[in-house]
Amino acid sequence: MFITRWLFSTNHKDIGTLYLLFGAWSGLIGACLSILMRMELTQPGSLLGSDQIFNVLVTAHAFIMIFFMVMPIMIGGFGNWLIPLMIGAPDMAFPRMNNMSFWLLPPALLLLLSSSYVEAGAGTGWTVYPPLSGNLVHSGPSVDLAIFSLHLAGASSILGAINFITTCINMKPKSMPMFNMPLFVWSVLITAIMLLLALPVLAAAITMLLTDRNLNTSFFDPCGGGDPVLFQHLFWFFGHPEVYILILPGFGIISSIITFYTGKKNTFGYTSMIWAMMSIAILGFVVWAHHMFTVGLDIDSRAYFTAATMIIAIPTGIKVFGWLATLAGGQIKWQTPIYWALGFIFLFTVGGMTGIILANSSLDIVLHDTYYVVAHFHYVLSMGAVFAIMGGLTHWFPLFTGYTLNQTMTKTQFWVMFVGVNMTFFPQHFLGLSGMPRRYSDFPDAFTLWNTMSSIGSTISMVAVLMSLFIVWEALTCKREVQMPLGKKTHVEWFFGSPPPYHTHTEPSFMLNNTYAPIRNLISYMEWPWPEK
């Protein structure tokens, strides 16, 4: 029974739970790697004893956090659990393919960890640039294992993307227009389309790297007429859409949370929010070379990529102001998820500001590969994506389990995490502006103060992570049942109880004349019997 339920599962709720648990476990590994890096960088001088080991930590931390934490939790976990509930589908379109999408991930993680255990490990950074990743500099099977790991994780994501696209378009009720789907469903649909377009390019790039290393081709070797810059173009054509893939489902989660806890019928500017996400997705594919301002692009290329990158700020700003307008005039219920959502808006906007600065090709010449860049993308990932994940977990935990979290503990954990991540990454702006380069295991004494502060902040963040584990354990142990507020009647995933039955529907829902929108207008929002805690 256990094996048939969890290994051969075709149930979207069980597979979503597997994704969430796997993502949490991987996230702990990634967090431990980051703590090791911050220990090395707390003071000048060597702690780990080898620059190669440090670079292996950097590489593994990035891969684990991106491919085995954020994507499985946001797309695999929340996507699987919520999308069938939100569109009234019995399950995902391809349930067995869904299961395979998940079970490709543990072997991929195993391959990635193995790459660190053999020879010297893959110390290339997550960008895997040749010639550093070539077989002269990284001899031995480490990089090959990392490449195979990426192949498996990529195959998993592509299969999942096909599944989500088919589900969102084909399995909603015939009378529900696309523009009546919840924003979270839209965000995952757009994310899946981006995955489907971006990942094959990465697969091509790393396959060429694999043959360069093992079959004596010279795609990226100038001696044979290749060009290492070609790899950078291929990699970043995947890599830039990837960072939007990481944040878009977070946008959907934040939209759900803010609409829910402000007691609004709908997010402000619902269609504009969808168009903004579409614009971000399209623009995300045409700005990749802003990661390459220092490799010697033409002046006109630099002008174009600077301008195009700045244009992405417009739809992003539309989303931020959409959230603020949703908050405006709402009867805000101050439960933990709205804390995470407000933290997301503030810190994601700060990260966006530094992104605008880095978009200037002239400034980026100086700031490229410094800690300024690290601070920028950790503000949008460590305080954007992760805050969205934490908000989603605290919001939907009662739906997934049927038990409520302790509000006092979750709020305390939010503040500890908030202080920790800001203390970790804000000083890194100063380090970058002072010229401290990324991916180095040691630094001049002049940088000691901010590095020490950053490391203290990372310890605080780690305490917050451990608190979150305790909070989940406490909720599952105390078993406080959920009392459903009527306010959830506009959020269709809550219709079926907490937790919903194992099989929510036996067939796709039927909806006459699009009853979805009018029902929203009939419900009064001023008299919600909210529970106190």
From Swiss-Prot:
UniProt: Cu cation binding residues: 240, 290-291
An example Gene Ontology biological process: mitochondrial electron transport, cytochrome c to oxygen
Enzyme class (EC, first level): translocase
EC number: 7.1.1.9
Membrane-crossing segments per the record: 12-40, 51-86, 95-117, 141-170, 183-212, 228-261, 270-286, 299-327, 336-357, 371-400, 407-433, 447-478
CDD domains: Cyt_c_Oxidase_I
Binding site for Fe(II)-heme a: 61, 378
Domain of life per record: Eukaryota
Pfam short name (any one): COX1
Residues at which heme a3 binds: 376
Mitochondrial intermembrane topological intervals: 41-50, 118-140, 213-227, 287-298, 358-370, 434-446
Catalysed conversion reaction: 4 Fe(II)-[cytochrome c] + O2 + 8 H(+)(in) = 4 Fe(III)-[cytochrome c] + 2 H2O + 4 H(+)(out)
Chief location category: mitochondrion
Residues annotated to bind O2: 244
Residues bound to Na(+): 40, 45, 441
Side Mitochondrial matrix, residues: 1-11, 87-94, 171-182, 262-269, 328-335, 401-406, 479-533
Pathway it works in: Energy metabolism; oxidative phosphorylation
Positions of Mg(2+) binding: 368-369
Protein location: Mitochondrion inner membrane
Bilayer topology annotation: Multi-pass membrane protein
Alphabetized InterPro entries for the sequence: Cyt_c_oxase-like_su1_dom (IPR023616), Cyt_c_oxase-like_su1_sf (IPR036927), Cyt_C_Oxase_1 (IPR000883), Cyt_c_Oxase_su1_BS (IPR023615), Cyt_c_oxase_su1_dom (IPR033944)
Family affiliation: Belongs to the heme-copper respiratory oxidase family.
Summary of the function given for this chain in its UniProt record: Component of the cytochrome c oxidase, the last enzyme in the mitochondrial electron transport chain which drives oxidative phosphorylation. The respiratory chain contains 3 multisubunit complexes succinate dehydrogenase (complex II, CII), ubiquinol-cytochrome c oxidoreductase (cytochrome b-c1 complex, complex III, CIII) and cytochrome c oxidase (complex IV, CIV), that cooperate to transfer electrons derived from NADH and succinate to molecular oxygen, creating an electrochemical gradient over the inner membrane that drives transmembrane transport and the ATP synthase.
Family matches, as PANTHER family: CYTOCHROME C OXIDASE SUBUNIT 1
Protein's name in the database: Cytochrome c oxidase subunit 1
Organism: Lycodon semicarinatus
Gene: MT-CO1
